[in-house]
């Protein structure tokens, strides 16, 4: 780190370094001496920057504890003020939208769930309306600094469009990042929802399994987020992980032509396969229009129609995981989404995968469940605050 205060750019850079240390230490306090040691800045420079951040309401002094008989003045630590800025995270799914406002520690202060409209434009309007309502209820509308929205498709920064989103149409003519940033008044990041789920899963892991793993979301659609060497892998065109589109025509004994993984293993596919089994006289104790959770539970107890539906879905998913394993050799596969986070589904995939690979990755159901993408959006919005917040506060 270069010390000094000879230029505005240098002051911002140094302020950024100090703010980053406060973010890393939060919620615990940190002393100016420790900040100087970690950043490589001089103590006078650190003291000046901490004073500026304190004046801006970003950090606050924590009164030091005194002990009887102590000689000398104890160090005066400072801590991040959690609600000095707020972020909004959004999971824009095919069946629901989750909108949440969080503080700088990532604590969700307010949250809203909205049934997804059938068009992307309506979903964007719902996100804006919900965000404004949550901020108004909190009484902190002016503190919003950043946002992140997870979308069920591939985001192309140029020309600011979402593609490959069959389950939520209408993105083709919608400059989503530009519109959301303008309407919310803060920078907004757009990211694939399963990539965000992978970000959240990586943060939740406390072992080396978080360095090389695949997060697979199985719900209305199917997608994957790949983490390699601890970094999210997007591919050359941002479309890495579009697992639901791969050809699985050889898995099912159908004459319907080309079948994708999504055609065989998604929630709608499992329901459709179950109805087909019932119509073809497979015994079942369930109603023909049973929910996927009911189908999976019935399959675990031997229901023939339910077992047929789950078996085909699990066989297709095991083939896809085998393909991913040959390609990227993940240490772990984390299943999320409404179907994927069900242990019955994971167990069924595991039993079939063992016949495909000599060494199988660890298969686990997500501990975050259906909130993984939302939590990843909060995390990403917090990360982007680091690049925008100091400039705005030190410039005031």
Task: Please annotate each region the language model reported.
Residues 1-143, 184, 204-206, 250-396:
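ATP-binding/phosphotransfer module of carbohydrate and carboxylate kinases, centering on a glycine-rich
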Residues 90, 104, 143-150, 154-260, ...:
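Phosphate-binding/catalytic loop of phosphoryl-transfer enzymes
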């Amino acid at each position: 780190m270069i010390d000094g205060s000879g230029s505005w750019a240098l002051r911002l850079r140094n302020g950024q370094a100090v703010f980053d240390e406060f973010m890393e230490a939060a919620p615990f306090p940190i002393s100016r001496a420790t900040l100087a040691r970690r950043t490589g800045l001089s103590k006078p420079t650190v003291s000046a920057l901490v004073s500026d951040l304190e004046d801006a309401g970003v950090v606050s002094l924590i009164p030091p504890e005194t002990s009887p008989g102590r000689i000398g003045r104890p160090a005066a630590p400072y801590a991040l003020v959690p609600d000095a800025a707020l972020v909004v995270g959004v999971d824009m799914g095919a069946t629901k939208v989750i909108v949440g406002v969080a503080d700088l520690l990532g604590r969700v202060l307010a949250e809203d769930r909205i049934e997804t409209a059938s068009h992307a434009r309506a979903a964007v309007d719902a996100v804006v309306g919900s965000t404004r309502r949550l901020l108004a209820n909190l009484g902190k509308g002016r503190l919003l600094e950043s946002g992140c929205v997870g979308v069920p498709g591939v985001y192309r920064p140029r020309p600011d469009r979402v593609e490959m989103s069959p389950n939520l149409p209408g993105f083709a003519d919608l400059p989503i990042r530009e519109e959301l940033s303008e309407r919310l008044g803060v920078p907004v990041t757009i990211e694939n929802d399963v990539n965000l789920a992978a970000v959240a899963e990586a943060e939740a892991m406390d072992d080396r399994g978080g360095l090389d793993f695949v997060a697979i979301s199985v719900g209305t659609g199917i997608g994957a987020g790949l983490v390699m060497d601890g970094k999210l892998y997007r591919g050359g065109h941002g479309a890495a992980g579009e697992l639901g589109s791969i050809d699985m025509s050889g898995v099912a004994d159908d004459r319907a032509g080309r079948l994708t993984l999504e055609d065989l293993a998604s929630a709608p596919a499992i329901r459709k396969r179950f109805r087909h089994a019932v119509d073809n006289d497979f015994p079942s104790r369930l109603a023909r229009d049973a929910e996927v959770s009911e189908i999976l539970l019935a399959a675990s107890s031997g229901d023939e129609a339910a077992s047929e539906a789950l078996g085909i879905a699990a066989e297709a998913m095991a083939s896809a995981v085998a393909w991913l394993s040959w390609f990227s050799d993940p240490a772990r596969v984390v299943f999320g989404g409404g179907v994927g986070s069900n242990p019955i589904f994971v167990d069924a995939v595991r039993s079939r995968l063992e016949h495909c690979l000599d060494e199988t990755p660890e298969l686990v159901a997500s501990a975050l469940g259906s909130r993984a993408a939302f939590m990843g959006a909060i995390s990403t919005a917090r990360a982007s605050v680091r690049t925008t917040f100091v400039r705005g506060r030190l410039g005031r």
